[in-house]
Curated annotation (Swiss-Prot):
Keywords: Electron transport, Iron, Metal-binding, Transport. This is Rubredoxin-2. GO terms for biological process: alkane catabolic process; electron transport chain. Rubredoxin is a small nonheme, iron protein lacking acid-labile sulfide. Its single Fe, chelated to 4 Cys, functions as an electron acceptor and may also stabilize the conformation of the molecule. Residues 7-58 form the Rubredoxin-like domain. Fe cation binds at C10, C15, C45, C48. Monomer. GO terms for molecular function: electron transfer activity; ferric iron binding.
Length: 62
């Protein structure tokens, strides 16, 4: 599994989705091994539809 600094959590109030590069995003056809930074700019959270700007790196959370 990816290290926390490689995973990103959606910061929307009702979501909490975590993007894990080891898993990718099958719903949006993002292959496993795709870093968050390499996701297309129009990629959206598969749970709530939020854009990439709504995500924060897990290691940045206190």
């Amino acid at each position: 599994m990816a290290e926390p600094q490689d995973m990103w959590r959606c910061q929307m109030v009702n979501c909490g989705y975590v993007y894990d590069p080891d898993r990718g995003d099958k719903r949006r056809k993002v292959p496993a091994g795709t870093k968050f930074e390499d996701l297309p700019e129009d990629w959206r959270c598969p749970v709530c539809g939020a854009g990439k700007k709504s995500f924060r790196r897990l290691s940045d959370e206190a």
